[in-house]
Amino acid sequence: VFSAVNDGVPTTTGKTRLFSSGPGSLGAAASGAGSRIELRDTEIRTRGFLGKGIDVRMDGSALAENISIDTGGRSAHGVYVDVSGSRVDLAGSAIVTRGIEACGIAVNYAPGAIVNVADTLARTGGDHASALFMPGASSVAFGDAYLQTAGYAAAGVDARKAVSTGRARPTCRPASACACMA
């Protein structure tokens, strides 16, 4: 795992590949105030229950540009943000998840968390796997994002109590899924 703790700021330089497998596997993580990961031209692949491509929590932050994330497993989210004060800036990237409840971007009850998404694809294939899931009072801003779901009851945007702004094109199949649930 590519990880930042205790005010660390690891940065990828050049083409980088991060692969991990097993329950709770992580591709990249930032945890704690001042901890930040910077990913450019990076491929992340995780396999396993509760795996995450990028995991940011407890005031950590991540900058990701021109990356690809591919997760496989139940609740294996592409980008996971937890605890208030955390921040993720994602641009020019692609997220693909395969698994039940494996969301593209999940902001888990993190009041004050900020996620900025620009020119990015988030595609999910599992049942109950929303492209963007934010059940709490968080904020997500989109700029030309494409959100696609293919599983049963998988919303493009599931934003209960959250704020979502910007341009996003959600498409959902089958008919049991919806573009936006607020």
PLM region spans:
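Beta-strand-rich solenoid/repeat architectures in extracellular/passenger domains
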Residues: G8-G24, R36-L50, G60-S75, R87-E101, ...
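Predominantly extracellular/luminal carbohydrate-interaction, adhesion, and secreted-enzyme modules
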Residues: V1-N6, L26-G32, K52-M58, H77-D82, ...
